[in-house]
């Protein structure tokens, strides 16, 4: 009986430590963000080769609305509840081809470029700036072309990443309309799946012991104007 109780308590604590990424700006949950498959159970993607590594969508349908943001500004992305596990936040953009609907575009192919990543503070343990936070300011590059975009939010939890397949990916995709901007086309684009391997040093890593003295973020370099 005690064993059963302990197992149930452990499972409950595990779920409560998970989170979703459901909202951008001043909108409501899942208004501008495509409803993720973890919207009820706060689960995660564990397979970097899964189609779910792209936007982790519960259904093929897009979100109800599109959030407007000015190039060169920032947009706030919200977690619910706050980020609990150690690991980096990363954000990618993908421009929707002209003539296609942002609400139905899948984001397939080498169309994603990274706009933000974070490095940990090194010491007795690795501490990422996102830990304990529930909102993040995502920079929208000033030089990119105006148009509709998908903004992919990703938190990679590394607390059990010492074994292959142990990293946990918390993901969602927001629908944006970017206004203003310039004419620059980012050259270093990746696809999801395809951008990561389960053996990448920023994915397969023991952050507990010995404590690393460096960290290599997975994916391409951050695009800068």
Curated annotation (Swiss-Prot):
Cofactor details (free text): Binds 1 copper ion per subunit.
Gene Ontology CC annotations of this record: extracellular region
Bridged cysteine pairs (disulfide): 55-173, 143-225
Alphabetized GO MF terms: metal ion binding; monooxygenase activity
EC number: 1.14.99.56
Reported regulation of activity: Is able to utilize various natural phenolic compounds as reducing agents. Most of these reducing agents are present in plants, either free or as lignin building blocks, such as sinapic acid, or as flavonoids such as catechin and dopamine. Phenolic compounds with 1,2-benzenediol and 1,2,3-benzenetriol moieties yield the highest release of oxidized and non-oxidized glucooligosaccharides from cellulose compared to monophenols or sulfur-containing compounds.
InterPro entries, per the entry: AA9, AA9_LPMO
Top-tier EC class: oxidoreductase
Signal peptide: 1-17
Biotechnological applications: Lignocellulose is the most abundant polymeric composite on Earth and is a recalcitrant but promising renewable substrate for industrial biotechnology applications. Together with cellobiose dehydrogenases (CDHs) an enzymatic system capable of oxidative cellulose cleavage is formed, which increases the efficiency of cellulases and put LPMOs at focus of biofuel research.
Keywords assigned by UniProt, alphabetized: Carbohydrate metabolism, Cellulose degradation, Copper, Disulfide bond, Metal-binding, Monooxygenase, Oxidoreductase, Polysaccharide degradation, Secreted, Signal
Localization per Swiss-Prot or TrEMBL: Secreted
Role: Lytic polysaccharide monooxygenase (LPMO) that depolymerizes crystalline and amorphous polysaccharides via the oxidation of scissile alpha- or beta-(1-4)-glycosidic bonds, yielding C1 or C4 oxidation products. Catalysis by LPMOs requires the reduction of the active-site copper from Cu(II) to Cu(I) by a reducing agent and H(2)O(2) or O(2) as a cosubstrate. Shows oxidative cleavage of xylan in addition to cellulose. Shows a strong synergistic effect with endoglucanase I (EGI) with a 16-fold higher release of detected oligosaccharides.
Protein family: Belongs to the polysaccharide monooxygenase AA9 family.
Protein name: AA9 family lytic polysaccharide monooxygenase A
